[in-house]
Regions:
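Nucleotidyltransferase catalytic core that binds NTPs
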Residues: 1-140
Length: 140
């Protein structure tokens, strides 16, 4: 039996997605199985402040990429640090997160998935810088 769209839970996945990779895609696919997937995309200013990186792609381009993925219902601007007020305002039922955020506490149901091994935006950034100097093709 098909689930009625109006009965779907609002599922929030917060992401920086400074460099999109297959770990992000896998997380999006898994998260979307729990309901209507809403991605809270970290603002550029928060990436600079908290992660100490200037994103390779501006917020509007990262948003455009994420909105093109079929499992994504919508993408909303988000802060690096989520709080209960934000979840309530956006009517979130379930929070999905990677294991790197497992210590966060919310009133909502929280589902934590393990990270995809051997991949991260930081790792891609470091490999790209190293390989640019050597003029090699990036292999991950």
């Amino acid at each position: 039996m098909k689930t009625k769209k109006k009965n779907l839970k609002n599922v929030l996945l917060d992401m920086s997605c400074s460099i999109m990779h297959h770990g992000h895609v896998r997380l999006i696919k898994r998260a979307s199985k729990y309901g209507r997937l809403i991605i809270s995309l970290t603002l550029d200013k928060d990436l600079i402040k908290y992660k100490k990186i200037k994103p390779e792609l501006a917020f509007k381009y990262r948003k455009e990429i994420l909105q093109s993925i079929k499992n994504v219902h919508k993408v909303i601007p988000g802060r690096y640090i989520l709080d209960q007020k934000f979840l309530n305002k956006n009517k979130i039922d379930i929070v999905v997160q990677g294991s790197d955020y497992k210590n966060r506490q919310f009133k909502n149901k929280v589902i934590t998935f393990p990270r995809t091994l051997s991949i991260s935006s930081s790792k891609i950034r470091k490999l790209a810088a190293k390989n640019t100097l050597k003029k090699k093709i990036l292999k991950i």
